[in-house]
A protein has these predicted regions:
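Small-residue-biased structural context
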Residues: 1-162
Length: 162
């Protein structure tokens, strides 16, 4: 499997996790309450972001983006857009952690405002990630296949699998 296919398949795994998180937030919004199971699922999602998603971004930034930058430049290109989006998602993961901590501190007292704040950040992050993954699949990876040689793609794959 080549490097770009590997990255795209990781995206598919991430979408499944995002769907689980979205379902938990929908339940919390519908019931105006966060159960222990809901909190556990959000905590698991935060761990997933930190242990799977953000390292995925770091691998792209360390191996794929520099190779593309050498070919097409950075500013005004997809390289810059993708790097910016990675930073934005990192900021949102931090905001999700803060909102989760506020929710946990408020329970078991009424905590709808905290659920709404958590929901706001989670919904933004999920929508942003879906768009980000689509952009990488349809634009960034296509550009990489056009401008990088088979040897460069193979080298990226070796480093990604590292």
């Amino acid at each position: 499997m080549d490097a770009l296919t590997e990255l795209a398949e990781e995206h598919a795994d991430f979408v499944e996790k995002l769907s689980e998180l979205e379902a938990a937030l929908d339940e919390m919004m519908g019931t105006h309450s966060a159960s222990d199971e809901d909190i556990e699922l959000v905590e698991e999602s935060v761990r997933f972001f930190e242990q799977e998603l953000l390292p995925h971004f770091e691998r792209e930034e360390k191996h794929l983006l520099p190779a593309l930058e050498r070919k097409i430049g950075r500013f005004g290109t997809l390289v810059n857009v993708v790097a910016y989006e990675h930073d934005e998602i990192r900021r949102e993961v931090h905001k999700i952690k803060e909102a989760l901590a506020a929710l946990q501190a408020k329970r078991p007292a009424p905590h709808l405002a905290e659920i709404e704040e958590l929901n706001r950040h989670v919904v933004f992050t999920i929508q942003f990630l879906w768009d980000h993954f689509r952009k990488e699949k349809t634009s960034l990876f296509a550009t990489a296949r056009e401008v990088l040689s088979p040897e460069e793609l193979e080298s990226i794959g070796v480093h990604l699998s590292g």
